[in-house]
Amino acid sequence: MSTVFKKTSSNGKFSIYLGKRDFVDDVDTVEPIDGVVLVDPEYLEGRKLFVRLTCAFRYGRDDLDVIGLTFRKDLYVQTKQVAPAEPTSIQGPLTALQERLLHKLGVNAYPFTLQMVANLPCSVTLQPGPEDSGKPCGVDFEVKSFCAENLEEKIPKSDSVQLVVRKVQFSALEPGPGPSAQTIRSFFLSSQPLQLQAWMDREVHYHGEAISVHVSINNYTNKVIRRIKIAVVQTTDVVLYSLDKYTKTVFVQEFTETVAANSSFSQTFAVTPLLAANCQKQGLALDGKLKHEDTNLASSTILRPGMNKELLGILVSYKVRVNLVVSYGGILGGLPASDVGVELPVILIHPKPSPGERAVATSSEDIVIEEFMQHNSQTQS
């Protein structure tokens, strides 16, 4: 069975159908958005049916718009006339989903295909605070359908239907050596230095997957290492309208392993950054959220060569920090000396779905329609 997402306009005159709401950017190309619009023929008579894809960056609250301040910038807009078909338009072959939907919905259904350009950002939301209301800041994508005599006509909200979709990046695990870092620190009254080395087997990790961090310490000093602290830090660069940078710790744990003076130590630590442990952190970057679905920490931004960073709006990156808490030995053992640390880059992303992971309908009876109403959703066959 295949699930199809449906949303109907407030006036009940037309509905939009999509086979999915997540569309994959594999860095070189982006999946097309294929769907169908069902419209009341009497309502359409004398007018045109349009479908529009908008990628927008919102960096302020909705309620501020009414006082003349606009905190939204459209990064990309694509509009297609679906009915009547334009003489110069070239309709590509129907997808399997469109064929099944047209068979199920009848002659008043019209197929459409929208192709995102490759240089658009992925869907990102900045986690709002407890007092915030309205749409959160971030980058979102919206598919909208409406009827009008022309594109200059002002469209009442009740005469259109919008469905939010997401652009997401998937990645396969890259073979080859993972990131590594090393530092050497000398201390006063110690003839030999402290050496810290940390590395990972690979840079790319999937959301929810434990990250194995290997730590090797050669402590040739007269200092004692009291604790090993490992943190995962998210850095969010808002590059569209300012040079704001937000740094949030999404995982931190102190391990009580002690490394005595003039000794060595080696161990692997498992760390797992999760949104569940960071739900109250305002400004944390998340993957774009659909109202009825949970989300996760934002995926790392993967840049194409020569890409204009400003067009992406928000850039997200992660790093693992390994810090040693070093103290003096002997009678001064309780006094902290300093921290010794290194950083490792890490990419958090979704795994590529297998080819057979998504069911494909073989007939119109294999379709289950999930309908989204104004404030809730329900499933119907």
From Swiss-Prot:
Tissue: Inner and outer segments, and the inner plexiform regions of the retina.
Gene3D superfamilies, per database record: 2.60.40.640, 2.60.40.840
Subcellular location: Photoreceptor inner segment; Cell projection, Cilium, Photoreceptor outer segment
GO cellular component terms, semicolon-separated: photoreceptor inner segment; photoreceptor outer segment; synapse
Record keywords, A-Z: Cell projection, Disulfide bond, Sensory transduction, Vision
GO molecular function: opsin binding; phosphoprotein binding
Listed SUPFAM superfamilies: E set domains
GO annotation (BP), single: signal transduction
Family recorded in the similarity comment: Belongs to the arrestin family.
SUBUNIT field: Homodimer; disulfide-linked in response to retinal illumination. Interacts with CXCR4; the interaction is dependent on the C-terminal phosphorylation of CXCR4 and modulates the calcium ion mobilization activity of CXCR4. Interacts with GPR84.
Cited function: May play a role in an as yet undefined retina-specific signal transduction. Could bind to photoactivated-phosphorylated red/green opsins.
Protein name: Arrestin-C
Organism (species): Mus musculus
